[in-house]
Amino acid sequence: MQNKSEKHFDRIRSFVLRAGRTTAGQQRAIDELGPEFLIPFQENLLDLQHAFNGSSRPKILEIGFGMGETTAKIAALRAADDFLAIEVHPPGVGALLKVIGETHLTNLRLIRHDAVEVLEKMLAPNSLDGIHIYFADPWHKKRHHKRRLIQAGFVKLLVSRLKPGAYLHLATDWHNYAEQMLLVLNAESGLTNTSAEKISIETFSGADVASDSEIAKDSFKEFKPTLEQLQSKHSGYVERPDYRPITKFENRGIKLGHGVWDLVYQKKS
């Protein structure tokens, strides 16, 4: 049962519905493999061990797996872990189920639903050994930054579901979003940045700092840096962990001249 004392943060969706047609092969995978590997959304807590046929292996959550190539590769590489992967788009769900069938992966389960509601309703506090969020929509335009997934309220929800000592791994190919992630996550008291490097903020300026009138509003939840953050050095990024393969999004970003930033945090004990 969900802890009623938990404060539900202002609604932010983990996804945007996009057009895309499910192929016959993807639909076949959903029909044939869905009953075994696709977990329906429910309003009560999921028994993670039961969901993986009694497995007591560490449980890793992935939010937004796209077409599932990276998820499948990581699950195959890390056979000693179980992976619960969330995606809303049927073509991606079908594509990953198809790979599961072709490669006989047994340590992977999928949920097709909004990740925020899955975290709130289905996953118990202190139940996860790790969380992966790779290449979430950066919402490039400044007026859309409020739609970005990595905001303080959502991060608190993530941290609450991690076990003490568990990790949170994010990656993005958009520098400004990387810096927002960094500032939001570094400010979360329940997390420790595992990076040894120190960096300065480059993509935000004084014009982005929240005004006193904005801060005074109870409804103001959008991330904006403080002047102190812009003037300080911060614990930074890490090298891409070996278990995360280079994705098509990463290659696309590199071709466009973008960098790729990995952030890894550990929940404090």
Describe the role of every protein-language-model region.
Residues 120-130:
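A short acidic, Gly/Pro-enriched loop at the edge of an enzyme's catalytic core
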Residues 164-172:
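Conserved beta-strand signature within the Rossmann-like core of class I S-adenosyl-L-methionine
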Residues 58-117:
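SAM cofactor-binding core of SAM-dependent methyltransferases
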Residues 1-61, 69-72, 76:
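S-adenosyl-L-methionine
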